[in-house]
From Swiss-Prot:
Similarity-based family: Belongs to the Gram-negative porin family.
Main localization category: membrane
GO term, biological process aspect, one: monoatomic ion transmembrane transport
Protein name: Major outer membrane protein P.IB
Amino acid sequence: MKKSLIALTLAALPVAAMADVTLYGAIKAGVQTYRSVEHTDGKVSKVETGSEIADFGSKIGFKGQEDLGNGLKAVWQLEQGASVAGTNTGWGNKQSFVGLKGGFGTIRAGSLNSPLKNTGANVNAWESGKFTGNVLEISGMAQREHRYLSVRYDSPEFAGFSGSVQYAPKDNSGSNGESYHVGLNYQNSGFFAQYAGLFQRYGEGTKKIEYDDQTYSIPSLFVEKLQVHRLVGGYDNNALYVSVAAQQQDAKLYGAMSGNSHNSQTEVAATAAYRFGNVTPRVSYAHGFKGTVDSANHDNTYDQVVVGAEYDFSKRTSALVSAGWLQGGKGADKIVSTASAVVLRHKF
C-alpha cells in the first residue's frame, strides 16, 4: 500500500511542475476563390483566377508563468504556425518571449508584436489564405504590422489608460533596421481608443536581381526615416461592434538614384458588426488616398469592401463566410480583384 502511495505521489510531481503551462492554438482551413483583372489604357491586359483548399492561419503555442514571490512572476510563450497545408516550419516563428511581470507592468524580450500589430484586431477583423490576403483582409493598412526581435515594456492599466514602448536593435532587424515603437490605449464602458507609432531609420522592402537566368527578390534598404502613425477608436459591447481607423506613413527613398525623395500616404478604414444569437454579420471598408512617390503625386489610391458573417457552433468552433472587392488605381489603369472564402475554425 505504501509503495502504491509513493508511486502515485511521484507520478503526480511532473503534473504539479507543469500546472502553470498552457497548451493553446487554433486550426483554420477552408476553400477560397480569387480573380484579378488588370486594365491598361482602358483595356484588359491580364487576368488571373484560382481556387484552392487553404490554411487560414493555424497555430499552436505553449505559455506559462512562475510565481517568484513578492508579486513578481516569470512569464513566457513559444508560438508557431501549424498550417494544415504543411507550409510552416520551425519553432517560435510567431510571438515568442520570456519576461517578468509585476506591479510595475510587464517587460519581455523575444520575437514580439509591435503596438501597430496589436491594434490590428480593431482594423482588420478578417482572415484569408495565401493568395487572398490583399482582398479578404484590410491589407493596405496592415503592411507595417510586424513582429520584431526586440525588448518591450507594457505598463499596468490606470483609470482605463495603458501604454507600451518597444525597441528593436539594428543588429537584430536585418533589412528592417533599428526601430522604435510606442503605443497608448484607453478603454471604458465598451469604448476604446488606441494610438500606435513606428519610427524606423531604414524601412523594409525588396528589390529584384537577375543571376544565372533567374530572377530573385532580396531584402533592400530602400527607404529611410520611416514614420507610421495610427489612430483607432470604437465601441464594443459584445453585441454591437464599431471601429474606425486612420493611418499616415511617411518616408524617403534611400540612395543616390532617388535623391532622398519624399513618399507618403494616408489610409482610413471602418468596420461594423452586430451579433444576432450565434450569427455575427460584418462589413468593412478601406480607402487609400492619393499619396506621393518620388516627391510627386502618385495614383496609388485604392478602395476596398469586405462583407461576411460568422456562425458559432460553440465557444471553440465557428465558421466564417466572406467576400471581398478591391480596386487599385482609377480610370484606364487599374486592377480590380475579387475573392471569397468559406472557413471552419476550431480553437483550443
